[in-house]
Every structure is written in structure tokens, then in C-alpha cells.
């Protein structure tokens, strides 16, 4: 739900004037070292550090987020996940390039962003790079449950990756909604989407744990099918897709927010007289 003081732009919400997009899946075409599970929602690189390029099964709709969570890491490699969009049909790629950067990009009509542990934010026009690189904390879910990117509103709840409670003391931040995970950490959530512009082009945006990193690329062909690109590269070994709730939050999500309002931190949820499955849901486990 949008804040009471801010009117909702109905054209920016799914389910009001346009149908919600179908669930995201990985394409059957992928790098030689990738194995996709039968559900099409988990991609794992089984050897080496390369040949890990994956694609979305279908082209993305405007404003649709292709969101992945890092499930497994592998020590000994230098580099991390890469994320982006391509206007190339994955079915036409034989073989799939070894790397998204630079191999796939060099084929043209492809835009890929290398995720790093720090400094993923893109400087805005008229603002210094130092300001863009400065760490920031996004509004909490209870204050602003939507992430606004250009003309789109995206429910923030599932965009944010969270570590398991009890592992680190800093996870006791108020309401455990703050962005405490490094972008390349296990359980971090990263997404890509495109936003059409009036001139017929589109901007590509990268989302990291609920924060918009700004337009990572401009001038994309909005009229052409755009597929998501996920390069399970180097220290990133396995990712899974996360499905978003578009439009209004579900009753389940709203109930979780009500429970969280009365909690000091996640560990306090264990003391509630609730079924374990519900406690885990409230703790994002």
C-alpha cells in the first residue's frame, strides 16, 4: 500500500489496468557449466568459474523485475554475479558465450552490469560520483512498502535479502528491514528491469536488496523483446529466482507486517505462540 499522503498512480501498479506478468523462469538455453533444476527456478554452475550465462525464459514486460537470490558461493575465484538485459533471442545463441562480459556484450544489443561488493550505484545526472557511491539505507517497509523506479511501483518486501537471525549482531537493527547484506553475499537479492521512455527507448535499472542503483544503461530498444541475463560467475555458484507480488500486497504479507510492528527484532518472534512455519515466514526464512 502506498503512503497515505501520496496518491497512487494507478498506471504504475500491476493488476489494475494491466495483467500481472507470469512467474519468471530460466531459459532452456544457458552456459555449458550451468544446470537448471526441473522447476526452472534454480541455476547452479557445476564446475570452473565461467560458462555460467543464463537467460530468462520469456522476454520481460516493462517494469517486471527478474529477481534472483544468491544461494551458494564458491571460494577461490575473483569476481561476482553479473546482471543485465539482451535483445538477442537466447534460442539463437549456439553456443552460449563463455562470459557475459565482454563476450555476450560484444555480440551487440546486450547490456550487462558487473555486481561488486561496493559502489554499485550509478551517478545521477548533475550529482557527483562520491554522492552516488555513499552508502544509504532505504526506507523501511512500514514507512514505504513500494520502491518507486521511474513510472513503476514495485512491492519492496521480497526485494530485500536478509541473513539468518542470530549469525551477526548487526542483524538486530530495528525491524530487521535495513539493507545489511553486502550485494555479493549469500542470500542477497538482485534484480533487473527496464523502464520505457517517451522517445521509444528504455532505461535498464539494477535493484540490490531493495535499493535502485539508478539507470545502469540508457537507450535500450523498448519495442524489441528484452531478456534478462544472469551470469553465475566466479565466486557466485548458485542462484534461485524470487517471485514478486505485484499490485497490492497479499493478506499474508500484510499480516506479517502487523506482527513485525510489535517486535523489537527477529529473534523476539521465536517467543510468540505461533506455528513454526508462520514464525519462519515472519523472519523471512
From Swiss-Prot:
One Gene Ontology molecular-function label: ubiquitin protein ligase activity
Gene Ontology cellular component annotations, sorted alphabetically: cytosol
Limits of the SOCS box domain: 250-285
Compartmental location: Cytoplasm
SMART domains attached to this UniProt entry: NEUZ, SOCS_box
Pathway: Protein modification; protein ubiquitination
Major location (coarse): cytoplasm
UniProt keyword annotations, A-Z: Cytoplasm, Ubl conjugation pathway
Entry comment describing in which tissues the protein is expressed: Expressed specifically in skeletal and cardiac muscles.
Domain NHR, residue spans: 23-244
Domain of life: Eukaryota
PROSITE patterns given in the database record: NHR (PS51065), SOCS (PS50225)
Region (Disordered): 1-20
A GO biological-process term: intracellular signal transduction
Pfam families noted in UniProt: Neuralized, SOCS_box
Quaternary organization: Probable component the ECS(NEURL2) E3 ubiquitin-protein ligase complex consisting of ELOB/Elongin B, ELOC/Elongin C, CUL5, RBX1 and NEURL2. Interacts with CTNNB1.
Domain notes: The SOCS domain mediates the interaction with ELOB and ELOC, while the NHR domain may be involved in ubiquitination substrate binding.
Purpose: Plays an important role in the process of myofiber differentiation and maturation. Probable substrate-recognition component of a SCF-like ECS (Elongin BC-CUL2/5-SOCS-box protein) E3 ubiquitin-protein ligase complex, which mediates the ubiquitination of proteins. Probably contributes to catalysis through recognition and positioning of the substrate and the ubiquitin-conjugating enzyme. During myogenesis, controls the ubiquitination and degradation of the specific pool of CTNNB1/beta-catenin located at the sarcolemma.
Protein name: Neuralized-like protein 2
Organism listed in the record: Homo sapiens (Human)
Primary gene name: NEURL2
Amino acid at each position: 500500500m502506498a503512503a497515505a499522503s501520496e496518491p497512487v498512480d494507478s498506471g504504475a501498479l500491476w493488476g489494475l489496468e494491466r495483467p500481472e506478468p507470469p512467474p519468471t523462469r530460466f531459459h532452456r538455453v544457458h552456459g555449458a557449466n550451468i544446470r537448471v533444476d526441473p522447476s526452472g527456478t534454480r541455476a547452479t554452475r557445476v564446475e570452473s568459474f565461467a560458462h555460467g550465462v543464463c537467460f530468462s525464459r520469456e522476454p520481460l514486460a516493462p517494469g517486471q523485475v527478474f529477481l534472483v537470490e544468491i544461494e551458494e558461493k564458491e571460494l577461490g575465484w575473483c569476481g561476482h554475479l553479473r546482471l543485465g538485459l539482451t535483445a538477442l533471442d537466447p534460442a539463437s545463441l549456439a553456443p552460449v558465450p563463455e562470459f557475459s562480459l565482454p563476450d555476450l556484450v560484444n555480440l551487440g544489443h546486450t547490456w550487462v552490469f558487473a555486481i561488486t561488493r561496493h559502489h554499485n550505484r550509478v551517478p545521477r545526472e548533475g550529482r557527483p560520483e562520491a554522492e552516488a557511491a555513499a552508502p544509504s539505507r532505504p526506507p523501511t517497509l512500514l514507512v514505504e512498502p513500494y520502491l518507486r523506479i521511474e513510472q513503476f511501483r514495485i512491492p519492496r518486501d521480497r526485494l530485500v535479502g536478509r541473513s539468518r537471525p542470530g549469525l551477526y549482531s548487526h542483524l538486530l537493527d530495528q525491524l530487521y528491514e535495513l539493507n545489511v547484506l553486502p550485494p555479493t553475499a549469500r542470500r542477497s537479492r538482485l534484480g533487473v528491469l527496464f523502464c520505457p521512455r517517451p522517445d521509444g527507448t528504455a532505461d535498464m535499472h539494477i535493484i540490490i536488496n531493495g535499493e535502485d542503483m539508478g539507470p545502469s544503461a540508457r537507450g535500450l530498444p523498448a519495442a524489441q523483446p528484452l531478456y534478462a541475463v544472469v551470469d553465475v560467475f566466479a565466486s557466485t555458484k548458485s542462484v534461485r529466482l524470487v517471485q514478486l507480488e505485484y499490485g497490492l500486497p497479499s493478506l499474508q504479507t500484510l499480516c506479517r507486517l502487523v506482527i513485525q510492528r510489535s517486535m523489537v527484532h527477529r529473534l523476539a518472534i521465536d517467543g510468540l505462540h505461533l506455528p513454526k512455519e508462520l514464525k519462519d515466514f515472519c523472519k523471512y526464512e
